[in-house]
Amino acid sequence: CDEENASILSDTIMRAERDGSVSHGLFRLPAYVSGLVSKKINGKARPELQNVAPSIIKVLGNNAVAPMVLSLGLPAVIDLAKKNGVAVLAITNSHHMAALWPETEAIAEAGLVGIACTSYKPAVAPAGATKALYGTNPISFAWPRPGKTPVVYDMATASMAMGEVQIAKREGHKVPLGTGLTKDGKETTDPGEIVDGGVILPFGGYKGSSIAMMV
């Protein structure tokens, strides 16, 4: 992993840990290291920016970690939005999106409204089902407030982020009923039964399920 990639990734981990998002802080470090060792993550990647349309840009991640990709794409999409009034940034071939709020917050701090979302590998069963179809598919929103900090939220469309379930398993905590199902499709408060072959449920039943589908 070269210095630029390492610096950007470590800053992302530090900010998540600082802001209390334990599931996206130091907890993620072993997975990042494993990805670098296995070559799933290109630690020397240089993402490429492409202009798709007047208000649409795309960044080819080249298997970089997402914060590295966003370091190129975020300033570009902010400039484009200020020029055209609206802009869209699409990201492909990046590894693990990390938390979304640092990016939407940066957009709001630039005086713009930001919305971000990402899909992920299946871990969440649709409402009424017992098999995974959706990822935890988070969505984040930020709104600027002149002279004040922006209004920002970042949430999984699952009942709980996968990282939070994994941390609960590691620390021996129970999770609320309704968080997920066992591999046999039964409700459980044991995070281990969810992580090891089970599924997470969407938040709010069919409402969260529909938002996950949209993402």
What residue ranges belong to the model's regions?
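Acidic, glycine/proline-rich low-complexity segments that act as flexible tails and inter-domain linkers
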Residues: C1-L9, R15, V22-K40, I167-K169, ...
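General structural feature for long, well-ordered alpha-helical segments within catalytic domains
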Residues: N5-L9, G25-R28, Y32, V69-V77, ...
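Active-site cofactor/substrate anionic-group-binding motifs, chiefly glycine-
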Residues: H24-I78
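Short, solvent-exposed beta-strand edge segments and adjacent coil->beta transition regions
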Residues: P54-I56, V86, G198-I200
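A generic, well-ordered mixed alpha/beta core segment in the N-terminal half of proteins
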Residues: I57-P146
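Phosphate/diphosphate-binding glycine-rich loops and adjacent basic-rich segments that engage nucleotide
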Residues: A123-E193
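Internal helical hairpin/lid segments
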Residues: G197-V215
